[in-house]
Amino acid sequence: MKTIEVDDELYSYIASHTKHIGESASDILRRMLKFSAASQPAAPVTKEVRVASPAIVEAKPVKTIKDKVRAMRELLLSDEYAEQKRAVNRFMLLLSTLYSLDAQAFAEATESLHGRTRVYFAADEQTLLKNGNQTKPKHVPGTPYWVITNTNTGRKCSMIEHIMQSMQFPAELIEKVCGTI
């Protein structure tokens, strides 16, 4: 998979055509351009072009804090989120979304997140079970992480709050998100 850098205006336009949480930019562009994975490109046009020097573009996924805030607000307003009847399901959906927005920042936030006697996040279920048989570890969908789920809602809110603060979300959004768990 290749990555390209686009300006904020174009990114916002593409992101505004998102149909569901987690939809990739490739899926959005394919839909917008009515281009399927199976379709073949038209016959190539050959034309000699002289390039003074090769253009090297380091492509980076660009997600500004504004884009992350928008994604979280969209999640809170989504039918998928509203349909979650249990706090643990909303918690898991929030974790998946935060990871999808910035996996590196999520990883850094979870490394520093643990209790006095408990580990909250791990790469496997056994690590969490070593810290207590009653931790009810669950795999966070779309991530390599497992999380303990037998905590009360307040602790789940604290965990989300820590991750979102570490990922530099605005305080009012963090408060709003925690109020929905």
UniProtKB/Swiss-Prot annotation:
The keyword Cytoplasm applies. Signal peptide: none annotated. This is Negative modulator of initiation of replication. HAMAP family: SeqA. GO terms for molecular function: DNA replication origin binding; double-stranded methylated DNA binding; hemi-methylated DNA-binding; identical protein binding; protein homodimerization activity. InterPro entries: Arc_rbn_hlx_hlx (IPR013321), Ribbon_hlx_hlx (IPR010985), SeqA (IPR005621), SeqA_DNA-bd_C (IPR026577), SeqA_DNA-bd_C_sf (IPR036835), SeqA_N (IPR033761). One of its GO terms (cellular component) is SeqA-DNA complex. It comes from Escherichia coli (strain K12). Belongs to the SeqA family. It comes from the Bacteria.
